[in-house]
């Protein structure tokens, strides 16, 4: 075979190889282009999915916060309702306790004719005070204590050699408080002190 024939055959082979390479390159470029398009589509779908997840997350957080607020408001409403009901009950109970107190004051525990009545009323009063104490109702009996304007209401002042100045010398009506909040002040007579004591003055409410 002549040199020209060999060269011609080599040229044909080279052209075939170049054609196949060119076709393969074109196919590869097309596949890469399609892959890039697919990647962009997937990235877009992922971004949309993440946005929806974030939106749903915010919705869940807002819903949880709203539920928590509703629970707190409901608990506060229940607490207020219970407090109002308990305060109303306690105020309605005060006349009953006052009547028991007056019954004890009007009965002589040393008199055999009224001794059993006194003991019965006293026992009932103690039982009632013990029962209401469980709900926060406490009696204010400041006999012999220093006058406290936050808990006591003075109806008058009198000189006294027995009680120091500004001391409760007589409780006219006992007071009551509910969970440390004043329901009714104790009505008291306050000592001005004796001749050898420094006299005291306080504001007396009508």
Swiss-Prot record:
Species of origin: Shewanella baltica (strain OS155 / ATCC BAA-1091)
Job description of the protein: Participates actively in the response to hyperosmotic and heat shock by preventing the aggregation of stress-denatured proteins, in association with DnaK and GrpE. It is the nucleotide exchange factor for DnaK and may function as a thermosensor. Unfolded proteins bind initially to DnaJ; upon interaction with the DnaJ-bound protein, DnaK hydrolyzes its bound ATP, resulting in the formation of a stable complex. GrpE releases ADP from DnaK; ATP binding to DnaK triggers the release of the substrate protein, thus completing the reaction cycle.
One Gene Ontology term from the biological process aspect of the record: protein folding
One GO molecular-function entry: protein-folding chaperone binding
SS bond list: none
Record PROSITE patterns: GRPE
Assembly and interaction partners: Homodimer.
Keyword set includes Chaperone: yes
Family named by the database record: Belongs to the GrpE family.
NCBIfam families linked to this entry: PRK14139.1, PRK14140.1, PRK14150.1
The keyword Metal-binding is assigned to this record: no
Name of the molecule in the record: Protein GrpE
Protein keywords: Chaperone, Cytoplasm, Stress response
Record-linked Pfam families: GrpE
GO cellular component terms attached to this protein's record: cytosol
Gene name of the record: grpE
InterPro entries: GrpE, GrpE_coiled_coil, GrpE_head
Domain of life: Bacteria
Localization per record: Cytoplasm
Matches recorded under PANTHER family: GRPE PROTEIN, GRPE PROTEIN HOMOLOG, MITOCHONDRIAL
């Amino acid at each position: 075979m002549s040199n020209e024939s060999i060269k011609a055959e080599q040229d044909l082979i080279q052209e075939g190889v170049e054609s196949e390479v060119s076709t393969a390159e074109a196919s590869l470029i097309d596949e890469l282009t399609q892959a890039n398009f697919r990647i962009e589509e997937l990235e877009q779908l992922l971004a949309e999915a993440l946005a929806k997840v974030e939106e749903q997350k915010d919705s869940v957080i807002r819903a949880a916060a709203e539920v928590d607020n509703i629970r707190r408001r409901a608990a506060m409403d229940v607490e207020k309702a219970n407090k109002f009901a308990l305060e109303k009950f306690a105020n309605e109970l005060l006349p009953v306790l006052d009547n028991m107190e007056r019954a004890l004051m009007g009965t002589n525990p040393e008199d055999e004719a009224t001794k059993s009545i006194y003991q019965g009323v006293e026992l009932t009063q103690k039982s009632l005070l013990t029962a209401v104490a469980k709900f926060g109702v406490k009696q204010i009996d400041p006999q012999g204590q220093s006058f406290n304007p936050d808990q006591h209401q003075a109806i008058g002042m009198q000189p006294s050699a027995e009680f120091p100045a500004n001391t409760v010398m007589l409780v006219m009506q006992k007071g009551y408080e509910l969970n440390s909040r004043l329901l009714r002040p104790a009505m008291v007579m306050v000592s001005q002190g004796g001749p050898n004591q420094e006299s005291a003055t306080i504001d007396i409410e009508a």
